[in-house]
Structures are given as C-alpha cells and as structure tokens.
Amino acid sequence: MARRNYKVLYVSGEVSPFVRVSSLADFMASFPQALEEEGFEARIMMPKYGIINDRKFRLHDVLRLSDIEVPLKEKTEMLHVKVTALPSSKIQTYFLYNEKHFKRSGLFSDLQLGGDHKGSAEKLIFFSVGVMETLVRLGWQPDIIHCNDWHAGLVPLLARTRYAKHDFFKKVKIVQSVHNVYRQGVFQPKMFQKHLDPEVFDGLEREGDDINLLATGIKYADLVTTTSPSYAKQIASDPESSFGMDKALKACKDRFHGILNGMDTRQWNPSSDKLIKKRYSAAQPELKLEDKKVLLEEVGLPFSEETPVVGVITTFDDVQGMGLLKESLSKLLELDLQLIVSGSGNKEFEQELRDLVEEHPEKLAVNTDFTDAFYHQMIAGLDMLIMPSRIESCGMKQMFAMNYGTVPIAYAGGGIVETIEEVSGDKGTGFVFTDYTAEALTAKLGEALSMFDDKERWAELMREGMERDFSWSASAEQYAELYREILG
C-alpha cells in the first residue's frame, strides 16, 4: 500500500527571505522543503508585516481568502490573505494581513524585547486565531500544525480548547519547536484576558503574574523539538541555560527531542549563489578572494590579501554575545586583522561600535542594515566568523560559513560541538573555546590567525569545511519518523 502524503502547516513569525531576524528564518526557508522530499505536503503561514515588499516577493491576493472573520472575545475583525511560493520551491506561503495590526508594524515584541507590548499582544492574538480561521476557509486540512518559537505558542492552546471540537481540527497533531529558549513571549495578561474567551485565557501558562507563550505551546503540543541533541539536554537540565524553561521541558521529557539543524544547500552554495560577486567551490577556494575584495569595498575597508578579515553576525544582546564582544573588542583591534560587525539591537552598543570605527577606520566596519544579499556576501567574503553567543541552540551561521570556506570560531555551547570539529593536527573545521571569557576568545582567535599565515594549511582547513555534509537529509528523516509516530 502506498504511504499517505500527510499535510503539515508551518506557523512562524519569520521566514527568509521575506523577513529575517534570527536563524529561525533560515530554518523556515529550508526545513519545509526537506520534509516535502520525505513525502509530506507542506504549507506555511506567517504575518504580513508592513516591512515585507509585496512586489519584490510577488505576493498576490487570493479572492476566496479575503474578508475572513477573526472572532475575538468582544469583537470580530477582518483578515485578508496574500500568497506566494517559497523561493526555489512550490511551497505555498500565506501572509495574514490586517491594516490595523500590520500596516506600519515590524515583528512581534514582548516584555523581554521592549517596544509595543500592548500592540504586539493584540496582533499576536489576531494572527493566531487568524491561522485557524484561514485553514477553515482554505479547506486545506493539516494532519500536523508545526509551531515555531513563542510567536506561534498560542496556536497549540487554541487547537486544544476553542477549536478542539471543530470537525476540521479534531484529529490534528501539534508540534512545538524551540529555536531560541531565551525568547519566550512574556506578556502582561490584560490584552489576553480582553481578547480571549475564558477557556483559552485560563489555559495560558504563567510566569509569575505574566503570560508565557513558549511554555504554553510546549504544554499543549504532542511533540516538542529543538535544534540539536546537545541543546536539548542542556536546556532540559539547566535552569540558567533554559532561562527557567527547564521545568516545562522536564514535564514533557517523553515527547521532547533534539534534532540537529540542517541547511539549504541549494540556497547556500558558493558555486551557484547568485547573491555573491564571485562563485567558487572547494576545488577552487582561491576564487573566494574576489568576494573578500567586494565585501571590504562595500563596508569601506581597504583590501590586503595578507590581512585576515574576521566577522561577527549577531543580535546585540547579552545572550547572543554582546557582553563578550564588548570585553574583547579592544584586544581584537590590537591584532593584525580587519573586523566587520553586523547586527542590530542595543542602540547604545551600536553607538559604541560607531565611535570605535572613528578611531579605527581601516580596521573596523559596522553594518546594521542586514539584507539577504549582504548576508551572503559577508559569509562569502570573510576569512573567519566569530560566534560569540553564550548559548547557541544550534544556529546555522557556522554551517553557512564552513560551506563557503569561512572558518568559524565559536563558544562550545549547544549545537556548536555537533557541527564544528575542533582543529587538531591536520583535521578539523574550526576553532572552539570552552571558557566564556574575552581571554579565551582572543587566544583561540590567535590560534586561527597563526594558521592563516600558513597558506597551504589554511586552504586545507577551508576545503575540510566546504566538503562536510550539512544538508537536511539525515535530520529530515528523523523528523519524518517522529511525525509518523504521533500520527499513529
């Protein structure tokens, strides 16, 4: 008997290339495609933020998905849906839109992130109920709804309360993925109480007096996953690493799995990448030099073949390594290198970096306008990539880097140890430091700089990383097996 093609809806607050803030967007750009290759039919739903360019991404209206009613506790609002295909695939991606909630807005924010908590709570509730109502109008009945991070944490609760008896959702299974345990979707309860019926509101998980959406998603999911086996063990056992989520994860230990992230080797392939200046491969890594020139020109730094270009791509907050970067900068700028820092977040730190650029105009550059094209060119043009995160769930930047012959230097947390092989003798793909200090980072970078001077050995190191298999193949098989398990 032929195996049935199950249907999976992926719900996410970000999907590359439409909008990108974290590695979740990269996951969403590639993982659904990998599961389609395992025999599942995938579709995606996300908010239509005002910052998304309709023309650039060829979004179009769907007549039968206009004027969808979204019933909230005290009122009904209207939802409109636009659609396009995920690039390089046929996967339908639905963008849920309401002028009041999304016309001028950026991404969701919560108490941890600052910003408009009230507005974010309202639009998140609207989006979550909208997902359920859009599915009914669409008539596409998923076997699984796969929710990603806290942005989608309300959907599992809705499926198990308000929509539990709806014929359309009676048999649906829920997966909740934890990509970033630090971001948990913490809100004051006022707006949730205002817009949600009591049976839904009473089911929300609490953190003190506040609502915790990630914990809510975890509680009501049939399957909970995260981005690597090491990270799963770490956050299920260590309150500090999990930011208090360890209790929720221990409570679901029999349905909690860590599966290593993969990457889209079609979108991220230096031999065919249309977003970089010069394409190259493991057979001709020296061609990468042209991308280094272009990158330096783009950020306004002078080019020297002998000077290594080191980069940092991160969010400017303490978990993603802002503190370590601050402590290390003066030491890094004393070394024989050029440094490019790309990221956004803490405005004070951004200004500190710009002040340092004034002092070191030929050694330091800062980029806060992070486009998809710049991301690819930076990964291609760097010699080394520093990953300063204290807790790295798995991340994909190190995989992208190695695939492009850019050598990673990272702290040994989470999935890093499963993706970077520490350089030892003539083996290895990168450099890993085990003490989370500026001294340890600088020392490990020093090792990398010494090896960079040995051109033959450095070329071998580049090739070693470029020849590793970081595709989704093995991990997609594991996910497919778990999907089929919960479906019975």
From Swiss-Prot:
UniProt key word Heme: no
Reactions catalysed, as given in the entry: [(1->4)-alpha-D-glucosyl](n) + ADP-alpha-D-glucose = [(1->4)-alpha-D-glucosyl](n+1) + ADP + H(+)
Stored InterPro entries: Glyco_trans_1 (IPR001296), GS/SS (IPR011835), Starch_synth_cat_dom (IPR013534)
CDD domains (UniProt xref): GT5_Glycogen_synthase_DULL1-like
E.C. number(s) listed in UniProt: 2.4.1.21
Positions that bind ADP-alpha-D-glucose: 20
Gene Ontology MF: a single term: alpha-1,4-glucan glucosyltransferase (ADP-glucose donor) activity
Domain of life: Bacteria
UniProt xrefs under SUPFAM superfamilies: UDP-Glycosyltransferase/glycogen phosphorylase (SSF53756)
Similarity remark: Belongs to the glycosyltransferase 1 family. Bacterial/plant glycogen synthase subfamily.
Reported function: Synthesizes alpha-1,4-glucan chains using ADP-glucose.
Protein name (Swiss-Prot/TrEMBL): Glycogen synthase
Species annotation: Chlorobaculum parvum (strain DSM 263 / NCIMB 8327) (Chlorobium vibrioforme subsp. thiosulfatophilum)
Gene that this polypeptide is encoded by: glgA
